[in-house]
Amino acid sequence: MSTLYHTCDKIEQRIIWIDCEMTGLDVEKQTLCEIALIVTDSELNTIATGPDIVIHQPKEVLDNMEEWPRNTFHENGLMEKIIASKYSMADAENEVIDFLKLHALPGKSPIAGNSIYMDRLFIKKYMPKLDKFAHYRCIDVSTIKGLVQRWYPDYKHPKKQCTHRAFDDIMESIAELKNYRESIFVKSTASSF
């Protein structure tokens, strides 16, 4: 179920925030098990809160999980939800696309998040319709964080909860980018290009 918020914005400037949980990081051996979305305007105001879907995976897939996600998903309760889920990969992708059709234009909105390139690799392989719906560009908050760590080593980064659940991770990514925007980026009214 999605939640809609009203703000003044241009639909072609919207950002699709995505976070995925995977059974590991090797896209050739592992798979998606959770995906959540939020659509914001260009000012990072929430336009709509999308679905947060746990995707069922069979025993043989879960038996092949990498150690870190196996341990983490047992601790945070995601493992039980994966086993109990009735969503197939196709069901999840279709629900995500249906949500995005209401709140973004195909091919216009970039996807955003922390280490979003990794999510994008899995999306490209397992949810190709979603990959095609989003603009080819990505907004990777972890890239900005890496630059801030190097250029402003004394900067106090926002604390994260690290629940390793997709929706929580998106909310933290949006808050993190808002923090960098307010405290690191210089406000300008003129373009230097």
Swiss-Prot record:
CDD domains: Orn (cd06135). Keywords: Exonuclease, Hydrolase, Nuclease. 3'-to-5' exoribonuclease specific for small oligoribonucleotides. One of its GO terms (molecular function) is 3'-5'-RNA exonuclease activity. Gene3D superfamilies: Ribonuclease H-like superfamily/Ribonuclease H. Signal peptide: none annotated. This is Probable oligoribonuclease. Residues 15-177 form the Exonuclease domain. The active site is at Y136. Transmembrane segments: none annotated. Belongs to the oligoribonuclease family. It comes from the Eukaryota. Pfam families: RNase_T. NCBIfam families: PRK05359.1 (NF003765). InterPro entries: Exonuclease_RNaseT/DNA_pol3 (IPR013520), Oligoribonuclease (IPR022894), RNaseH-like_sf (IPR012337), RNaseH_sf (IPR036397). It comes from Caenorhabditis elegans. Its EC number is 3.1.15.-.
